């Protein structure tokens, strides 16, 4: 039996199984040992079953796949060769695990006889990602002793675990040489595949799993709790779940606190600012019940409120993951937000607390005065909605600016917002944004800090794949300005935290064949954004700001509002 032919048969069954589990995008890094998998992925692309993407940097490739999976809400497959190529996927796997994004990670491996004996590019790959995958599938070296039906069943069981929990399935696939001399005809006619002929011409999985009917029932004490003083807190949510939360909370007369990732229009904007007011915060803590939708809040003030609240606490979240870092004694609903709302009709009543609305109005005027008309980090955050395309999506990086956007920006209802807030790292942000562009097939606006951009420069190469207008705003405050918030000596901050680079990104844009602009005023910015939306490709727009302006304004707003005396 030809080893190369059977390697391909083995790979064919793996990839055909994944396609039947919803995979339609395959992200591939170049490598020799992964050739059987790559060639079968190419065959599937030629048949119209998948679209393949390539990238030379496995770390960026992992985040690119993550972005596609976020936008499509379908699993994405990744193929890499053996050795440290596999390890470079770890950051994306961690982020996927934290946020329940489904990826199938296929790592080609040397065969067992080459492990731990000094063989080239052979590392210990079995279970190498520890507990971060929802399932680790350590396949044996391809052998006809194992039936194709066994292989499919093993993979589908792992896929079932993924559907239940959300996250990564790691499939380690050792291959012996030779890898290259198999023909498609020899693979398709191999006797090992004969029991699968009927399955291969269909699109159904091997095992049919009936979908669970998760009907949301009204809580037995809802008629009691809906008469009480409540606070609705909304974190990261899929866009389709955001509709209706605002009107529901308003009808109840309850206070609504929203994260920028929620897609919910706030009734009392600038929560991250006005929650700094101690008087209002203390009154808010007198609520009888908090109902939280989603999780992973950016706002420090919202997190502080959740930590301090000791009353009745309900969490509505569909993933089933533990998402209460403050360990409340709570009632948990594993449900989508809009399904839960339908099962819990509101009781119309007047607002029980008026100070948040008064403070919010005060903040609106005060913030406008403080921000001014120049093009700065804060004015960019405040006026970001004016730069967004209709029917587009927004990706926010992890930097000072995401906090300014969360504090100052009011987005249209259900405008899709994507972030990497599972582990909140600065790695892979450009790659994720590129993947979201591919997965959504919509215009994309990405807002990323300069240090994050430097960290992921290779991923600019991925934007060659986009087919919709894509604007990458790089907010260049000359290093990690977010560290200005730390109570550390200024000299130590520069040397060990901020790390100023004193550069710009014009030559980087040229290297990756990206359109580039560096506007100095709002008029210039509006003009270059309009031009960018006329092109179905990526444009890098660099906005240079004074290093401490954004953090200084942010701290000033918090300080001023914390002592404000506002009459309801």
UniProtKB/Swiss-Prot annotation:
Binds 1 thiamine pyrophosphate per subunit. GO terms for biological process: menaquinone biosynthetic process. GO terms for molecular function: 2-succinyl-5-enolpyruvyl-6-hydroxy-3-cyclohexene-1-carboxylic-acid synthase activity; magnesium ion binding; manganese ion binding; thiamine pyrophosphate binding. It is an enzyme of class 2 (transferase). It comes from the Bacteria. CDD domains: TPP_PYR_MenD, TPP_SHCHC_synthase. It catalyses: isochorismate + 2-oxoglutarate + H(+) = 5-enolpyruvoyl-6-hydroxy-2-succinyl-cyclohex-3-ene-1-carboxylate + CO2. Keywords: Magnesium, Manganese, Menaquinone biosynthesis, Metal-binding, Thiamine pyrophosphate, Transferase. InterPro entries: MenaQ_synth_MenD, MenD_middle, THDP-binding, Thiamin_PyroP_enz_TPP-bd_dom, TPP_enzyme_TPP-bd. The keyword Transferase applies. Gene3D superfamilies: 3.40.50.970, TPP-binding domain. Its EC number is 2.2.1.9. Pathway: Quinol/quinone metabolism; 1,4-dihydroxy-2-naphthoate biosynthesis; 1,4-dihydroxy-2-naphthoate from chorismate: step 2/7; Quinol/quinone metabolism; menaquinone biosynthesis. Its cofactor is Mg(2+); Mn(2+); thiamine diphosphate. It holds the Pfam family TPP_enzyme_M_2. Homodimer. Catalyzes the thiamine diphosphate-dependent decarboxylation of 2-oxoglutarate and the subsequent addition of the resulting succinic semialdehyde-thiamine pyrophosphate anion to isochorismate to yield 2-succinyl-5-enolpyruvyl-6-hydroxy-3-cyclohexene-1-carboxylate (SEPHCHC). HAMAP family: MenD. Belongs to the TPP enzyme family. MenD subfamily. This is 2-succinyl-5-enolpyruvyl-6-hydroxy-3-cyclohexene-1-carboxylate synthase. The lineage of its organism: Bacteria, Pseudomonadati, Pseudomonadota, Gammaproteobacteria, Pasteurellales. The gene is menD.
